Design a protein with these regions (language model features):
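A short glycine-rich, Lys/Arg-flanked "PGG" loop and its adjoining helix->strand segment in the class I
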Residues: 137-151
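Conserved SAM-binding strand-loop segment of SAM-dependent methyltransferases
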Residues: 98-113
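A short acidic, Gly/Pro-enriched loop at the edge of an enzyme's catalytic core
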Residues: 112-124
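Conserved SAM-binding loop of SAM-dependent methyltransferases across substrates and taxa
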Residues: 63-76
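Conserved class I S-adenosyl-L-methionine
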Residues: 152-206
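Conserved alpha-helix/loop element of class I SAM-dependent methyltransferases that forms part
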Residues: 11-55, 69
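Conserved SAM/SAH-binding beta-strand->alpha-helix loop
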Residues: 85-87
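A short SAM/SAH-binding and catalytic strip from SAM-dependent methyltransferases
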Residues: 122-137, 153, 159
């Protein structure tokens, strides 16, 4: 399963690449669990302020943008991003160079191998990743091994009821034996244009606007 996922994200970079972090973050955009604004919840004893934000952050499954975004918005932190996709990491490197993010390091690495980094982290972000692993529980266990005793982990997993419309469409496309080809992506796009408006309104994910999201 991991090899299939890796091949998909090599072909289609995900999420949609951000070209300028200053412009993106200037619109008030940030990560949903970012310590720079949730630290009072994560460390109510004031540890984050005492350390002036000098924490060690791991972005596990960073995709095309997340590690660079964390480094940009947490300039005093040391940020490590890992991902299976070299194509995604290359875009992270583009952002790193563009914004001179000296506090960012990037590695092509599986979550199951995270202990090979030889580091312990104050904060771990893993959004929309663990459920793609062959054994999500093992992935979570490995992340826990590199989390400091007073560390915080921010996770997002797909929820059944919030994505029921997506799962129905996925089942339909599986029955059509669609594969990860440009032609089959075109079939998906055409199908979406034929859905009733009420159904489309329940599928208003930004991912539907570009091929990698589909």
């Amino acid at each position: 399963m991991a090899d299939v996922v890796a091949a998909q994200y090599e072909k289609w970079i995900y999420p949609q690449p951000i070209m300028d972090l200053a412009e993106y973050c200037g619109k008030g955009m940030t990560d949903g669990v970012a310590p720079h604004y949730l630290h009072p919840l994560f460390w109510p004893d004031g540890e984050y302020e005492r350390r002036e934000g000098k924490i060690n952050i791991l972005v596990a499954g960073c995709g095309a943008n997340a590690a660079a975004r964390y480094a940009y918005q947490h300039p005093n932190a040391q940020v490590t991003g890992i991902d299976l996709s070299e194509a995604s990491l290359n875009h992270e490197r583009y952002l790193q160079e563009k914004h001179q993010l000296d506090n960012l390091s990037l590695r092509q690495l599986r979550i199951e191998e995270v202990s090979s980094l030889g580091q312990q982290f104050d904060f771990i972000d893993s959004v929309g990743v663990l459920h793609h692993l062959p054994n999500p529980e093992e992935g979570l266990r490995q992340l826990k091994t590199v989390l400091k005793p007073n560390g915080v982990m921010g996770l997002m997993l797909y929820g059944l009821y919030g994505r029921v419309g997506v799962y129905m469409l996925q089942e339909f496309f599986h029955r059509l034996y669609l594969q990860q080809t440009e032609g089959d992506v075109a079939v998906v796009k055409e199908t979406l244009t034929q859905l009733p408006k009420a159904q489309l309104d329940r599928l208003r994910f930004t991912e539907l606007s570009y091929d990698a999201g589909l």
